Each structure stands twice: as structure tokens, then as C-alpha cells.
Amino acid sequence: MAAKKTESLSFDAALGELEQIVQQLEQGDLPLETALKQFERGIQLARVSKQKLEQAEQQVQILLQQGEQEKLTPFTVEQTSGQNAEEE
């Protein structure tokens, strides 16, 4: 697979490529040098994906601040398990 410029990939493309790399590494059939290159590529993709998620989170917070004057609360996993973020 030709190495694409990591920063220019969309989040979905980076995640898809990362999933393929994980599958290849889990199979354990790659030669050591190839596995190391794939691991390095995976780290790059994971970092870029994390940055894109953080940027999206910031955009959502900005949009919420513009739309409402209420206090924003950080998203936590507990809020998705039946608790409402407005119940504080």
C-alpha cells in the first residue's frame, strides 16, 4: 500500500487504514521489518485521528456556546449510561 500523507486523510480513512494495519499485525504473518513499518504507520494514524477528534470536539463546543448561553459540561462516559447531562 502506498503511504499517503497522514495529515491529509479524513478521520474515516485514517481509522479504516488503522484497522487494516491492526488486522495485519494481529495475524503475525508479516516479516519483522514490515511489521515495524506498519506499526509506525499505525502510530501516525492514531495520532492524527486523535487530533481530528479533538478538533471536532472543539467545534462542537463552540457551536453549543454560540447556540446557547448555558454552562457546558465536559462529556463523560457516565453521561451516556442513562444519566442526563442537565441533571447537576
Swiss-Prot record:
Q: Name one GO molecular function term.
A: exodeoxyribonuclease VII activity
Q: Biological process (GO) annotations?
A: DNA catabolic process
Entry keyword Membrane: no
Q: Which reaction does it catalyse?
A: Exonucleolytic cleavage in either 5'- to 3'- or 3'- to 5'-direction to yield nucleoside 5'-phosphates
Q: Where in the cell is it found?
A: Cytoplasm
Give the residue range of the signal peptide.
Answer: none
Enzyme Commission code = 3.1.11.6
**Which UniProt keywords are present, listed alphabetically?**
Cytoplasm, Exonuclease, Hydrolase, Nuclease
User: Which Gene Ontology CC terms are recorded?
Assistant: cytosol; exodeoxyribonuclease VII complex
Its domain of life reads Bacteria
What are the disulfide bonds?
none
Enzyme class at the top of the EC tree? hydrolase
What SUPFAM superfamilies does the database record attribute to this sequence? XseB-like
Name the PANTHER family for this protein: EXODEOXYRIBONUCLEASE 7 SMALL SUBUNIT
* The protein's assembly and partners: Heterooligomer composed of large and small subunits.
Q: What does this protein do?
A: Bidirectionally degrades single-stranded DNA into large acid-insoluble oligonucleotides, which are then degraded further into small acid-soluble oligonucleotides.
**Family label:** Belongs to the XseB family.
Spell out the HAMAP family in the cross-references: Exonuc_7_S
The molecule here is called Exodeoxyribonuclease 7 small subunit
Gene behind this chain?
Answer: xseB
